Structure formats: structure tokens, C-alpha cells
Amino acid sequence: MPTVLQLAISRGGVPKLPILEADVTPLGIAGDVQKNRKYHGGPNQALLLITSEGLDELKAAGYPVYPGALGENVTTVGLDRRQVRLGQRYRLGAEVEIEITKMREPCRTLAPYGPTIQKAVYDPDVKAGRPESPRWGLAGFYVKVLQPGRLYPGDPIVLLADPC
């Protein structure tokens, strides 16, 4: 079963640092700050979710990434990024419900991890919403919080609805 590996926040920018529990609100994790509100945050981008398996792929390709490095609030383990689709709804832990709303389009914030990382995690197929891209989900998924609540590392992740 997929689970929450790490929860993370920052005062803006990357990396986000691990926390032991999260108060998840409709606008994200309490205490998390986004510097550029024009492109980050808001109800449809309340959280950024990235799979640990995707991070492992990037590490194997030589990028010095780790949970929280790419700015994600929620790092998962056991969730197949290739099966995640826009519109899917998940329960995280006992209380939190989310909906996948948007693919994350990487920006210059990721430059510390290598000059080619943006191309390694995102391509025209991802931008067009085609999950067959080998880069699908590597940059992460933005989510909307449908049901706020408490969340902890180790909490299960359950698919509730799949509109596909």
C-alpha cells in the first residue's frame, strides 16, 4: 500500500525540510511559505506531491535530489507516478482528501540540482497531459485539498476516485 514517506515545509524556496506532522488546510500545510505566489500556492496548488521512486530515478541519473529537495510537501513511497492521473482523488491518512489538479511545470528554482534537471523531469508530452511520457510525474503533481486534517509520515494513501 502506498504511504506518506515525508512531509515538508519551508520559509520559501527549496529544499523543503521534514516535519513530524502536518496540519493540512485548503491552502496547504500550515507553516509552509511560497515566495512567488503568482506561480505557486493557492487552492488548486495547495500541495506538491512527488514519489520517492521518481526521486530514486533522478538520483540514478546523477541528480543530487532527496525528499524535499524539489520543493514537495508530500513525498510518497509505493505510489506509481505512471498511474497517477489528473482528477484522481486520494485519502491521505485518516482525514485528508486530495484531488490531483495539475502537473508541476519546473522553474529555475530547481537549478541547484543541475543545469539539465528541468528537461529531465518535464517534456512536451507531460505539458500536453500525456501520461505515456517517461517523465510523467517526475516534477510532481499539484493537488487541491478537498478535506483538511492532520497528516503524518507513514500514513496510508488510498485511491478514492479515478475519473479516467
Please state what every model-predicted region is.
Residues 1-164:
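Metal-cofactor-dependent catalytic cores
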